[in-house]
From Swiss-Prot:
Belongs to the peptidase T1B family. Its main location: cytoplasm. This is Proteasome subunit beta 2. The gene is psmB2. The 20S proteasome core is composed of 14 alpha and 14 beta subunits that assemble into four stacked heptameric rings, resulting in a barrel-shaped structure. The two inner rings, each composed of seven catalytic beta subunits, are sandwiched by two outer rings, each composed of seven alpha subunits. The catalytic chamber with the active sites is on the inside of the barrel. Has a gated structure, the ends of the cylinder being occluded by the N-termini of the alpha-subunits. Is capped at one or both ends by the proteasome regulatory ATPase, PAN. The active site is at residue 7. It comes from the Archaea. GO terms for molecular function: threonine-type endopeptidase activity. It is found in: Cytoplasm.
Amino acid sequence: MEVLPGTTVGIRVSDGVVLAAEKRVSYGLYLMSKSGKKVYRILDKMGMASAGLMADMQTLARIVEAEMRLYELDSNISPKVWTVAKLLSYILYERRLFPYYAEIVVGGLDEEGSHLYSLDPIGAIIEDDYVALGSGTQLAISIVESNYKKDMSLDEALSLALKSVYAAMKRDAASGDGVDVLVIGKSGTLEKTYPLSELQSVAV
């Protein structure tokens, strides 16, 4: 299967999860936009991020958010992170002959703790402590793998995610133009965009 454009990183620590993705939208050699959003908040303590085609990312995010909010209303309980990942797996596998061009990472907090899952375009699920997806994977994962510690803080995980995506942006032509992050912790959830000018001082 072809490598999907962009760079997305997810990191899990005991206190929560960090999802990060750069903002460049490219089709082949053409730069479509410098302000694409590839990180999505699904529920208060859950989110997803993706690499691939923007239309497919947005479609999947809308479907999952709608289904999970209906689940909350119908059952009066908050879904587990695994529930979100499994729903995405069903959706992706159902379209395996004409797949969505998206690799996805799902992360969040539930009553069992923090969780991080990666899914390929046809729905295989892998749970891990960290993951990198997209065309900048090799550059990003080398940074994460060299610096990740199970006992690191959420702030340290955020710094590592920014550093890894920024490293990919400097060498991968399909990645660039800033980073969106979703930080999901026990004390709350933070969504923030880091422009290039800020990244140069933060991702060190």
